[in-house]
Amino acid sequence: MEKPFGFVVIDKPSGLTSHDCVNRLRKVFGIRKIGHSGTLDPAVTGVLPIAIGDATRLISYLQGSKAYTGIIQLGATTNTDDMQGEIIESKAWPLITQNDINYLLENFRGEILQKPPIFSSVHIKGERAYKKARKGEKFDLIPKKVTINKLNLISWSQNKGELLVDVDCSTGTYIRSLARDIGDKIGCGGYLKSLRRTKAYNFIENHSVKLPEKSDFYPEEDKPKVLNPNIFFKHLSSFELISEEEIISWRSGRKISFQNNIKRLKVSKNNEVEDSFIHNNNILVLNKENKILGIACLDESFAIKPKVVFNAIG
């Protein structure tokens, strides 16, 4: 039987860690080589891409923003910047209109400096910030640049003090920090009450499936569909190997001549081909059936140089 190869996109339920979902799928497929991309906190639900089999070697080549829908609770701050933490300060939220809030949100659109939550996985002198925070240690985190591509106010409840927002942002953005900072800007504090991820890289909600229930046995028909990885790498240019000789050379780790075969390069909208192609730009290598054979780059001699080779020989 052919080994599974591709991605399963789980609609992560609340209460489980991302690693819990990976462990469940390891039991479902009966293999260890499974890994996720883009950790979600236990309370967060939504799109969790999980690579199956050798597709784990493609994780580092994923690109794209992430999108979320969340509720920001005004009138309090917590030590974790979400509802899982302890309330450390409370203050009544002001009488404020949706137009007022939209005006304030303009401060958080585009490239901004953001300080991560103290309960986060950021490293401080070799130790995770959340471990230091749990021990009661005092420390300060350095703000980092993140990009908020979209920040829309969907609704505002004056009675509940709740903002429902839609966010599209760069990888590494903390929505908890965004909630905290928006609350500070309004002047009453705030924290993230709930969060759902709707997009991660090129994975969207329509790709997602329910996490299989715990079981000692998973019949084939109950296993989630493994999606072809090609559809998630459209940001990469691709090159097709057309002869058996080329494929054997590729699987043996040898370079493939490119200079006379430039017409076989399909350029993604993210790249441009000119007289001098950008060296070391990642290229998806495919066979005639559009199956991924690996990842390559162009070297100085204008040859396709293997970086990731699937089904290697020799």
Curated annotation (Swiss-Prot):
InterPro entries named in the record: PsdUridine_synth_cat_dom_sf, PsdUridine_synth_N, tRNA_psdUridine_synth_TruB, TruB_C
Annotated catalytic residues: D41 (nucleophile)
Pfam families: TruB_C_2 (PF16198), TruB_N (PF01509)
Keyword annotations from UniProtKB, A to Z: Isomerase, tRNA processing
Known EC number: 5.4.99.25
Source organism superkingdom: Bacteria
This protein's record includes keyword Hydrolase: no
Enzyme class: isomerase
Catalytic activity: uridine(55) in tRNA = pseudouridine(55) in tRNA
SUPFAM superfamilies membership: Pseudouridine synthase (SSF55120)
GO biological process terms, semicolon-separated: mRNA pseudouridine synthesis; tRNA pseudouridine synthesis
A GO molecular-function descriptor: tRNA pseudouridine(55) synthase activity
Family affiliation: Belongs to the pseudouridine synthase TruB family. Type 1 subfamily.
HAMAP family, sorted: TruB_bact
Function: Responsible for synthesis of pseudouridine from uracil-55 in the psi GC loop of transfer RNAs.
Protein name: tRNA pseudouridine synthase B
Protein's organism: Prochlorococcus marinus (strain NATL1A)
